[in-house]
C-alpha cells in the first residue's frame, strides 16, 4: 500500500490523499464514516485520526469500505447486526451511540432496537443487554429531543 505523505507542521507526516487501495474501498469507507458521524467526507480522516490515531483510522476506513457495501445484506440488516455485536461486546457504549442513529436512518425502528437488546439478554446476559438497552433508550430520547 502506497501512501501520499508530505511533511506537515512541526515535521509531522501528513497523509494527503489517504492510502492508494484496490478499487474504491477508501472512498466508500470515507462515505460510510461521513454518514455515521454526520460530517463531510473531507473531515473524516482528521476526525478518525483524532479518535484512534492514523494507523487504526486507515484500517477502519478501508475495512468499512468493504463491510458496508455489498448486495448480500441491506443497510438496515447490517445496522441491526452491528448494534447487536456492540451490545454483546459490552464496554463500547461510545461506539454504540452513533450506530443507534445509523440503524434508524437505515430503516430500523425504536421498537426493533429495544426488542433486539431484550433478545440479547438471553444470549449475552442481562448485564450487557441492560447496559445496551439503556444506551439505546438514551440515544433514542436524545434524537427525539433533537427533532423537536
Predicted regions and their residues:
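Short, structured motif recognition centered on aromatic/hydrophobic residues
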Residues: 77-86, 116-120
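Extended intrinsically disordered, low-complexity coil regions enriched in Ser, Thr, Gly, Ala
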Residues: 92-115, 129-140
Amino acid at each position: 500500500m502506497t501512501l501520499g505523505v508530505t511533511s506537515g507542521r512541526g515535521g509531522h507526516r501528513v497523509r494527503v490523499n489517504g492510502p492508494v487501495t484496490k478499487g474504491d474501498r477508501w472512498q466508500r469507507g470515507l462515505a460510510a464514516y461521513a454518514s455515521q458521524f454526520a460530517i463531510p467526507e473531507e473531515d473524516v480522516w482528521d476526525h478518525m485520526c483524532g479518535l484512534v490515531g492514523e494507523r487504526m483510522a486507515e484500517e477502519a476506513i478501508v475495512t468499512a469500505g468493504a463491510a458496508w457495501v455489498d448486495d448480500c445484506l441491506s443497510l438496515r440488516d447490517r445496522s441491526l447486526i452491528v448494534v447487536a455485536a456492540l451490545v454483546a461486546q459490552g464496554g463500547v457504549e461510545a461506539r454504540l451511540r452513533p450506530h443507534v442513529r445509523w440503524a434508524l436512518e437505515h430503516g430500523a425502528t425504536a421498537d426493533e432496537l429495544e426488542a433486539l437488546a431484550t433478545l440479547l439478554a438471553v444470549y449475552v446476559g442481562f448485564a450487557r443487554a441492560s447496559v445496551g438497552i439503556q444506551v439505546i433508550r438514551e440515544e433514542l430520547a436524545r434524537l427525539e429531543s433533537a427533532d423537536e
